[in-house]
UniProtKB/Swiss-Prot annotation:
Keywords: Isomerase. The keyword Isomerase applies. It is an enzyme of class 5 (isomerase). This is Fucose mutarotase. Belongs to the RbsD / FucU family. One of its GO terms (biological process) is fucosylation. Involved in the interconversion between alpha- and beta-L-fucoses. L-Fucose (6-deoxy-L-galactose) exists as alpha-L-fucose (29.5%) and beta-L-fucose (70.5%), the beta-form is metabolized through the salvage pathway. GDP-L-fucose formed either by the de novo or salvage pathways is transported into the endoplasmic reticulum, where it serves as a substrate for N- and O-glycosylations by fucosyltransferases. Fucosylated structures expressed on cell surfaces or secreted in biological fluids are believed to play a critical role in cell-cell adhesion and recognition processes. It catalyses: alpha-L-fucose = beta-L-fucose. It comes from Mus musculus. Widely expressed in various tissues and cell lines, including kidney, liver, and pancreas, marginally in muscle and testis.
Amino acid sequence: MVALKGIPKVLSPELLFALARMGHGDEIVLADANFPTSSICQCGPVEIRADGLDIPQLLEAVLRLLPLDTYVESPAAVMDLVPSDKEKGLQTPIWKRYESLLLEADCKKTLMKLERFEFYERAKKAFAVVATGEMALYGNIILKKGTLDLGPS
């Protein structure tokens, strides 16, 4: 927990440090409980633990601080359903929640859907992967950091 004004209490010091160190175009993965976080992080991303937290509450807090990239097709991506789950008609209600939170953060672009192994490869190049306790299937989301318009100096 962080004892600072205006900082959501779900953001750990490690996560705040990672968000501050990220530059324009860097990505962070908010990973569900089934995601192979430790394996992916062996390829380079910083591993941050947020066990017990759901992704929507963490996403809401992160979006209060993290500017999203406006120069890309979509600054947010999820793992698309595998063909067998599509055939079964599996629903992903968590994506609607993500879209709502992104809209509240002034992101009007739609969620990009990445094929499973494409998502894993992109996660390997992320700045950090945050392991959460999210139990929803297909709950992983990648966010691309944008820039702040600080006006004239």
